[in-house]
């Protein structure tokens, strides 16, 4: 859950943030490596931890993962290149490519480096088999149901593009091209609960029995939730592992094979390690609503606009005023973009909400919590706004792991 800025449990506290504000001009992202390490250690019972790098794809974060023996999931050619640059080895199981299509350039890359492919469509198997017989593959199965904190994060069922609906149809293709099936994969969406978790683990058992193929691994996918709100409960990792371990043992006994249990977290490993630091540049009254405008928009943090996602917001005064947190004002927090939807306090569907925040003035700072996942990774240049820096806190030091982009760099692509 969001940690108050007066906490002493990690580096994301008021004193450290004030030092960073002096050293690096806002806006910028901050990650605490120690928090990432702690989250990795919570998952050590799984045989393989495979980081969903789409959640936070900075190569310096990937190197942290590599140093802790975390493997990598890539979902694009660019993510394959990031993984290779970060030190992950091809022709092993350190990198797996997961997708529903294989364009020509990506196909040639995975074939050249023998990167295992987690296939979400039958066409992928055919295309891969034609140029790379014997290639190691997984089947991403759509279990015909899904779950998500938003409709847009539901990755199962007939409204989802992800996965293979009839996995039994994949077996003749695999045999025709002499592909090597090594694993089965399921991922039904983000923010899964225990009821759906049990359902998907039972589905994995069902499909493993029906297909009856000699595999070496099953992947539970990702979707592990984190508590974005103070009243959210953290997931019980022991219970999560136990449910999947039962499934693994049943499949292992049926197939007569040792089965490795993989997990593919993204948000769980990095979300709570990150904050977004912004500066207030305007306040205004619009009818009965109080607006505070900061120098980051949905081009930086997309989740509130795209999903109606909640991020806790803290305030640090830019002067020596004393804060009375008991005296709050219902406040709408918005960004600088030329878009009505550039509001951080909204529900899914765009309904504007308010947050109870202290009195805020121009020159104060707003801190968005738990932005380490799907924050910087989803940033864009919309409104021709440059990407902002990323700062990593590690070994009592702060390191710029992505410098501030310039407008000239954006325009150079078009010359």
From Swiss-Prot:
InterPro entries, A to Z: Ala_racemase/Decarboxylase_C, DAP_deCOOHase_LysA, De-COase2_C, De-COase2_CS, De-COase2_N, Orn/DAP/Arg_de-COase, PLP-binding_barrel
The organism's place on the tree of life at top rank: Bacteria
Enzyme class: lyase
Subunit structure comment from the entry: Homodimer.
Disulfide bonds: none
Residues recorded with modification N6-(pyridoxal phosphate)lysine: 54
Binding site for pyridoxal 5'-phosphate: 223, 264-267, 374
Record flagged with keyword rRNA processing: no
Pathway(s) per entry: Amino-acid biosynthesis; L-lysine biosynthesis via DAP pathway; L-lysine from DL-2,6-diaminopimelate: step 1/1
UniProt source species: Buchnera aphidicola subsp. Acyrthosiphon pisum (strain APS)
Active site: 338 (proton donor)
GO-annotated molecular function: diaminopimelate decarboxylase activity; pyridoxal phosphate binding
UniProt xrefs under NCBIfam families: lysA
Protein name: Diaminopimelate decarboxylase
Protein's job: Specifically catalyzes the decarboxylation of meso-diaminopimelate (meso-DAP) to L-lysine.
Single biological process term from Gene Ontology: lysine biosynthetic process via diaminopimelate
Family to which this protein belongs: Belongs to the Orn/Lys/Arg decarboxylase class-II family. LysA subfamily.
Binding sites annotated in the UniProt record for substrate: 267, 303, 307, 339, 374
CDD domains reported in the protein's UniProt record: PLPDE_III_DapDC
E.C. number: 4.1.1.20
Keyword Hydrolase: no
Keywords, comma-separated and alphabetical: Amino-acid biosynthesis, Decarboxylase, Lyase, Lysine biosynthesis, Pyridoxal phosphate
Cofactor(s) listed: pyridoxal 5'-phosphate
Catalytic activity: meso-2,6-diaminopimelate + H(+) = L-lysine + CO2
């Amino acid at each position: 859950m969001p940690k108050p800025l007066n906490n002493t449990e990690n580096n994301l506290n008021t004193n450290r943030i004030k030092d960073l504000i002096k050293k690096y001009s806002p806006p910028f992202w901050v990650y605490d490596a120690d928090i990432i390490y702690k989250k990795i250690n919570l998952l050590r019972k799984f045989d393989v931890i495979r980081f969903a790098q789409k959640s936070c794809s900075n190569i310096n974060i990937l190197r942290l993962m590599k140093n802790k023996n975390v493997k990598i999931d890539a979902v694009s050619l660019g993510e394959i290149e990031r993984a290779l640059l970060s030190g992950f080895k091809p022709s092993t199981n350190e990198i797996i490519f997961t997708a529903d299509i294989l364009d020509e350039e990506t196909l040639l890359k995975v074939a050249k480096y023998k990167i295992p492919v987690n296939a979400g469509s039958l066409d992928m198997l055919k295309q891969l088999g034609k140029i790379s017989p014997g290639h190691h593959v997984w089947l991403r199965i759509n279990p015909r149901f899904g779950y998500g904190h938003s409709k847009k994060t539901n990755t199962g069922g007939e409204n989802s593009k992800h996965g293979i609906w009839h996995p039994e149809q994949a077996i003749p293709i695999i045999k025709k091209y002499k592909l090597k099936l090594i694993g089965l994969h399921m991922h039904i969406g983000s923010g899964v609960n225990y009821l759906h978790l049990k359902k998907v683990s039972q589905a994995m058992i069902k499909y493993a029995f029906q297909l009856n193929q000699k595999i070496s691994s099953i992947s539970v996918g990702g979707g592990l939730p984190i508590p974005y709100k103070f009243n959210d409960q953290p997931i019980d990792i022991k219970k999560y592992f136990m449910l999947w371990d039962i499934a693994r043992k049943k499949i292992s006994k049926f197939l007569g094979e040792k089965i490795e249990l993989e997990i593919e977290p993204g948000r769980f490993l990095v979300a709570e390690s990150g904050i977004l630091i912004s500066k207030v540049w305007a306040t205004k009254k619009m009818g009965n609503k109080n607006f505070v405008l900061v120098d980051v928009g949905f081009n930086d943090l997309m989740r509130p606009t795209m999903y109606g996602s909640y991020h806790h917001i803290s305030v640090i005064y830019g002067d020596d005023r004393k804060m009375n947190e008991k005296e709050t004002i219902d406040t709408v927090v918005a960004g600088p973009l030329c878009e009505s939807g550039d509001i951080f306090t909204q529900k899914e569907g765009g309904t504007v909400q308010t947050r109870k925040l202290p009195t805020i003035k121009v020159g104060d700072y707003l801190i968005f919590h738990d932005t380490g996942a799907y924050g910087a990774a989803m940033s864009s240049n919309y409104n021709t706004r440059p990407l902002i820096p990323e700062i990593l806190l590690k070994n009592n030091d702060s390191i710029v792991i992505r410098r501030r982009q310039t407008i000239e760099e954006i325009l150079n692509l078009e010359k």
